[in-house]
Amino acid sequence: SVVAHMGIVLSGLMTLTMWGISGSYTLMIAHGLCSSGLFCLANISYERMGSRSLLINKGLLNFMPSLSLWWFLLCSSNM
C-alpha cells in the first residue's frame, strides 16, 4: 500500500504540472492521515479485546459499532 501510494505521488510529481503537484501533495496528506488512523484503530481494538487474533475478535460490529464504521471509512479511503 505504501509503495503504491508513493509511486502515484512520484508519478504526479514527475508530470511537473500544477495538477500533478497538488494531487501528489493531497495524496501524501491523505495517506498519512489514513495510515495513522488505521494504526490507531488497531491499537484501540487490541487494548479493548486483548488479542490480535482475528478468530478471537469476531463480532466487532456488535461489540463496537462506531469503531467498525471508522474501520470501513479508513480502509476504503486508503484504497
From Swiss-Prot:
One GO BP: electron transport coupled proton transport
InterPro entries assigned: NADH_UbQ_OxRdtase, ND/Mrp_TM
The protein, known as: NADH-ubiquinone oxidoreductase chain 4
GO molecular function, one term: NADH dehydrogenase (ubiquinone) activity
Highest taxon of source: Eukaryota
Protein family per UniProt: Belongs to the complex I subunit 4 family.
Gene coding for it: ND4
Topology term for the membrane: Multi-pass membrane protein
Compartment annotation: Mitochondrion membrane
Keyword field: Electron transport, Membrane, Mitochondrion, NAD, Respiratory chain, Translocase, Transmembrane, Transmembrane helix, Transport, Ubiquinone
Residue stretches spanning the membrane: 24-44, 54-74
EC number: 7.1.1.2
Predominant localisation class: mitochondrion
The reaction(s) this protein catalyses: a ubiquinone + NADH + 5 H(+)(in) = a ubiquinol + NAD(+) + 4 H(+)(out)
Function: Core subunit of the mitochondrial membrane respiratory chain NADH dehydrogenase (Complex I) that is believed to belong to the minimal assembly required for catalysis. Complex I functions in the transfer of electrons from NADH to the respiratory chain. The immediate electron acceptor for the enzyme is believed to be ubiquinone.
Cellular compartments per GO CC: mitochondrial membrane
